[in-house]
């Protein structure tokens, strides 16, 4: 399919327009700030697909309306979706700002004494706030000399956080959420809210009945050669777990083979429906070859599909992973049970980090007392205050086994462009494929089963819809926990031991929903959550502010919270500011 161009970041160097030596003395310094900003972003950030980020710098420094308009014309022609304005000096506030109301924007005012960059920053932000076009403020903590071309660490942190979140906003705009099926078992997140996607994310919803998946499989609307490759890959790499079904429900070898084949076909066809597949056009299936321009999807499955056909566990797990029979590649975002709101949290996490996401039920809170009663052993270390069992039959990415390694040799989940084939193979080797339990999945299927390594930093998130308020975001930073094998086996056996498990210990603050682990579980807004690698809650907070989604629960340090400057005018308590500002400005793409 034709590659849609990726959004770029526009850099706007603004300058004092007075000639006779004033502007002339500032041209080089101002343009160098723009170049340094672009170089930093290009070096440190990639698109979620792995492509290098492109920065577009205005052809000239911007002193007023004419040069601002020329800059906007250039940006409009080059798909600029995010802008950063930079200056070391006084400039003319409202005459030089970026006025596009839907484009995330930041201003870096150089902290120097020779020229008042801070004064312009304050004046420009005042104009933004008065006009109702929020912008992010960037101002270094320490004074720099005029000839200092370095970017201080605190400025770099804000530039990169803004750029990551801004690119996520721009990348989602114009894409679609593919809803395959409808509401699964009454789960509210699968009541797909078109207005939410349109007004807050700038996306469309493509609703497709599950019979379309059936049609594609039955009528061979797929690449038949690829199917053979996928089957050969599975035969080489799949390690099968215990079949816990009663004897009358166990399948024979031929039946198991048919279930595997259909499971792989489901993965292929859902992928083709999301992004298209030119091979289908070569077969004369031009319409089907186009796909639905989907950046995320969900599959209802239960129960109208799973009562008669193989479940979506294998397809979802493989699509959400960073690898399959085609090798290492960008993960897809596919929500089990068509939980679109958890799918959005997965989408946020992937766009911010480039990594695969772990979709899970927020299944059980285990108190230290309960664990000791059941196992006779005490929790300790990161788990000493209790743990949450995150487990779901469906779409946890196989990367979640954490068999990949960071630069220090520690377990992690890497952006897909950093993953070696050996690491992908290690994740596969750590996974068992267990026959689905018949009473739950009458059509069969295979569930992935792995155990996440312990001591890995994660951020758990969830988007919820509240009537009268709209979407809210929950964030809980914490760590995976490794339990003694005997303890894990005893606890795991009390639920469904054929599914993947992550034992999660949130970081506690002693306040509110983070008073203790029980409070985290009790305040979680739905039955599902998402794990994103790393402590990246601050990035989620910045992204949410750009989209006007208030954060109702988080344990991120206040010093890391980065929102538009206008939020400070909405009261004195930081979280109340967020609610009032989001209500005041409304969704980014108001409908």
From Swiss-Prot:
User: Which reactions are catalysed by this chain?
Assistant: L-fucose = L-fuculose
Q: Which PANTHER family match?
A: L-FUCOSE ISOMERASE
Annotated compartments = Cytoplasm
Q: Which UniProt keywords apply?
A: Carbohydrate metabolism, Cytoplasm, Fucose metabolism, Isomerase, Manganese, Metal-binding
Name this polypeptide is given:
L-fucose isomerase
InterPro entries in the cross-refs: Fuc/Ara_isomerase_C (IPR004216), Fuc_iso_dom3_sf (IPR038393), Fuc_isomerase_C (IPR015888), Fucose_iso_dom1_sf (IPR038391), Fucose_iso_N1 (IPR012888), Fucose_isomerase (IPR005763), Fucose_isomerase_dom2_sf (IPR038392), Fucose_isomerase_N/cen_sf (IPR009015)
Q: Which Pfam families match?
A: Fucose_iso_C, Fucose_iso_N1, Fucose_iso_N2
Q: Does the keyword Kinase apply?
A: no
Description of how the protein assembles with itself and partners = Homohexamer.
Concerning NCBIfam families, the annotation shows: fucI, PRK10991.1
Report which residue ranges the record marks as coiled coil: none
Pathway assignment reads:
Carbohydrate degradation; L-fucose degradation; L-lactaldehyde and glycerone phosphate from L-fucose: step 1/3
Outline what the protein does: Converts the aldose L-fucose into the corresponding ketose L-fuculose.
What does the record list as GO biological process?
D-arabinose catabolic process; L-fucose catabolic process
Return the GO cellular component terms, semicolon-separated. cytoplasm
Give the enzyme class. Answer: isomerase
Where Mn(2+) is bound, by residue? Answer: 337, 361, 528
Annotated disulfide bonds: none
